[in-house]
């Protein structure tokens, strides 16, 4: 489409479960992107894991053709975005490729914490925002009340908000007309020189790397020689196209359009999300600003259960990194687990999803170590360090001070659950910053240590509020803290994979909980097994797995007592040798247990 006034690029932003993927389904259905036989729920949620969990993980794009009431045909490029805070990087990339957004709010629940986070990102990208109130067919729907909430909390005019029921297809025409009449078209191309933003990329086993682009200026054609400005790599374009949501091959993409191209790219490192793509012969003068990279805040180790799978894990992580630029990894080794990778994530759900994708898509069986965050260490000799692996923590005698990251959390909760939510935040060492009411819902702002959040905070928040509380957070500051390295010893040997950095006030509780759980998980041997938790040289918790007793006298039916004594002495000597040289095998379930002791 060469006339930009008939193009609209827009995102759908909303809190989890407010109906953005369902609305996307109805828009595709209404515009004839798929016929009735091909339609399925959550069309744009392409991964099985997305459909099973009912969440969007990857931002998806689709081109819709719509004949408006004014008689003109418009080309609508829709970017469906995730709602969970852990996938905010996906949201930011989608918003950078668009000029406007549909803000979908559940009219039975109102504005939630992650609605705020995503809408503020849209405002930062200078988006025109159209409020859409979903689920108006339900008896609990309160559209007028929610309109007032949007105006009071977000500060945008909601008087002309579109009322819809995405599930039943009510009001879809009104949404499409609002997109045409209220959202701006792309800016006119200022030059014929190709300038395109690399929005996303993924690996296709047949085509190599597939790149999703938003064309800012010029045109992208088949057989063009294009250059990635960030890496200076040059490729010949083989296929150009867009999604309807089926893959549709065309010969050209014009300014203002969103589409994909392939160029037999085999090196994953050449495709950096946010890079600028231009014509090799006639390069653009200035690169696009790209995206602000998201910094991982939660780290853990991935180790293959079979060491022969290491290379497969390495290749799999490279392919996933291409598809999800917000997680990072580097090689590390552990005396207990062998060689693996230290990986960084935007949150615990992000970690869980990556782990599940490695298992499903690449058939990998992994051991995952306990999650940790980045700590700042200041040494007595003036040196400063940043560590996220407890094994790298220097001797406490050489440390002058340590700082841990704190977050600013916004929690929206119905007023009947305020007491339990405040108790949970207090238990997690939280400091209350603000407490206000919007009708029957409370908005609580807390300052919380990230270390306390990465274990089980989200699950416990949902549990204590019966699923009604919503939670959004952002990094705040680093502050001095009394931190210690909690180490686990099995038969006197430190198991580095189970070490974790905790606040001194929580060390005994967490150490005791882990010792009790390991006692149930490690199989009994023919010797006593001591499981200990230590801070420095002090043992703070201990559990003992009692030995299995083998009856060596079972074959003796009487006779000289010296024969029995000889057998018992031999058994005693054998057990002494086992205590000295025996290795205790720790099952994988013990390492998984380390992820689940946060609230005990």
Curated annotation (Swiss-Prot):
PANTHER family given in the database record: TRANSLATION FACTOR GUF1 HOMOLOG, CHLOROPLASTIC, TRANSLATION FACTOR GUF1-RELATED
GO biological process, one term: positive regulation of translation
Binding site for GTP: 17-22, 134-137
Residue ranges constituting the tr-type G domain according to the UniProt record: 5-187
Job of this protein: Required for accurate and efficient protein synthesis under certain stress conditions. May act as a fidelity factor of the translation reaction, by catalyzing a one-codon backward translocation of tRNAs on improperly translocated ribosomes. Back-translocation proceeds from a post-translocation (POST) complex to a pre-translocation (PRE) complex, thus giving elongation factor G a second chance to translocate the tRNAs correctly. Binds to ribosomes in a GTP-dependent manner.
UniProt GO MF annotations: GTP binding; GTPase activity; guanosine tetraphosphate binding; ribosome binding; translation elongation factor activity
One protein family per Pfam: GTP_EFTU
Family to which the UniProt record says this protein belongs: Belongs to the TRAFAC class translation factor GTPase superfamily. Classic translation factor GTPase family. LepA subfamily.
E.C. number: 3.6.5.n1
GO cellular component terms attached to this protein's record: plasma membrane
Name of the protein described by the UniProt record: Elongation factor 4
Topology in the lipid bilayer: Peripheral membrane protein
Record's catalysed reaction(s): GTP + H2O = GDP + phosphate + H(+)
Subcellular location: Cell inner membrane
Keyword Membrane included in the entry's annotation: yes
Signal peptide: none
Keyword tags: Cell inner membrane, Cell membrane, GTP-binding, Hydrolase, Membrane, Nucleotide-binding, Protein biosynthesis
Entry superkingdom: Bacteria
Name of the gene encoding the protein in the UniProt record: lepA
């Amino acid at each position: 489409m060469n006339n930009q006034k008939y193009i609209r690029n827009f995102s759908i932003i909303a809190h989890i479960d407010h109906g953005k993927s369902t609305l996307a389904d109805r828009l595709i259905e209404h515009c004839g992107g798929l016929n009735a036989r091909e339609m399925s729920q959550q069309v744009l949620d392409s991964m099985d894991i997305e459909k099973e969990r009912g969440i969007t993980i990857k931002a998806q794009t689709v081109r819709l053709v719509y004949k408006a009431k004014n008689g003109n045909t418009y080309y609508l490029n829709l970017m469906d975005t995730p709602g969970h805070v852990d996938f905010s990087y996906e949201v930011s990339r989608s918003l950078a490729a668009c000029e406007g957004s549909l803000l979908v709010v559940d009219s039975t629940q109102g504005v939630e914490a992650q609605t705020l986070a995503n809408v503020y990102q849209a405002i930062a990208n200078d988006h025109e925002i159209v409020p859409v109130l979903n689920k108006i067919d339900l008896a609990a729907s309160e559209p007028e009340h929610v309109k007032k909430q949007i105006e009071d909390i977000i500060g945008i005019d909601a008087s002309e908000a579109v009322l819809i029921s995405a599930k039943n297809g009510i009001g879809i025409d009104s949404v499409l007309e609002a997109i045409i009449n209220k959202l701006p078209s792309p800016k006119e191309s200022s030059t014929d020189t190709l300038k395109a933003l690399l929005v996303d990329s993924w690996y296709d086993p047949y085509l190599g790397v597939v790149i999703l682009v938003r064309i800012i200026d010029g045109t992208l054609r088949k057989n063009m020689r294009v250059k990635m400005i960030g890496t200076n790599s040059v490729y010949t374009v083989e296929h150009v196209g867009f999604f309807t949501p089926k893959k549709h091959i065309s010969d050209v993409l014009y300014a203002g359009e969103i589409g994909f191209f392939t160029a037999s790219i085999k090196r994953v490192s050449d495709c950096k999300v946010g890079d600028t793509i231009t014509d090799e012969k006639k390069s653009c003068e200035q690169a696009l600003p790209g995206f602000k990279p998201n910094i991982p805040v939660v780290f853990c180790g991935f180790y293959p259960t079979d060491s022969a799978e290491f290379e497969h894990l390495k290749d799999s992580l490279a392919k996933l990194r291409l598809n999800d630029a917000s997680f990072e990894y580097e090689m590390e080794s552990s005396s207990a687990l062998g060689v693996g990778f230290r990986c960084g994530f935007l949150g615990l759900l992000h970690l869980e999803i990556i782990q599940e994708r490695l298992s499903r898509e690449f058939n990998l069986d992994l051991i995952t170590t306990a999650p940790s965050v980045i700590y700042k260490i200041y040494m007595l000799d003036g040196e400063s360090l940043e560590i996220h692996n407890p094994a790298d923590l220097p001797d406490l005698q050489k440390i002058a001070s340590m700082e841990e990251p704190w977050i600013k959390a916004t929690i929206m909760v119905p007023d009947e659950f305020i007491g339990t939510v405040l108790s949970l935040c207090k238990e997690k060492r939280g400091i209350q910053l603000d407490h206000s009411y919007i009708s029957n819902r409370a908005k609580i702002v807390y300052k919380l240590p990230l270390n306390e959040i990465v274990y089980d905070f989200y699950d416990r928040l949902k549990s204590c509020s019966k699923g009604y509380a919503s939670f959004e957070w952002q990094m705040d500051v680093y502050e001095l803290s009394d931190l210690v390295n909690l180490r686990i010893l099995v038969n006197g040997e430190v198991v580095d994979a189970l070490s974790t950095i905790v606040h001194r006030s929580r060390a005994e509780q967490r150490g005791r909980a882990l010792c009790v759980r390991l006692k149930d998980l490690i199989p009994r041997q023919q010797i006593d097994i001591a499981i200990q938790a230590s801070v420095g040289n002090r043992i703070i918790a201990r559990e003992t797995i009692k030995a299995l007793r083998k009856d060596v006298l079972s074959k003796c039916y009487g006779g000289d007592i010296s024969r029995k004594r000889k057998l018992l002495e031999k058994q005693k000597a054998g057990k002494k040798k086992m205590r000295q040289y025996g290795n205790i095998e720790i099952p994988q379930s013990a390492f998984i247990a380390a992820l689940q002791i946060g609230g005990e």
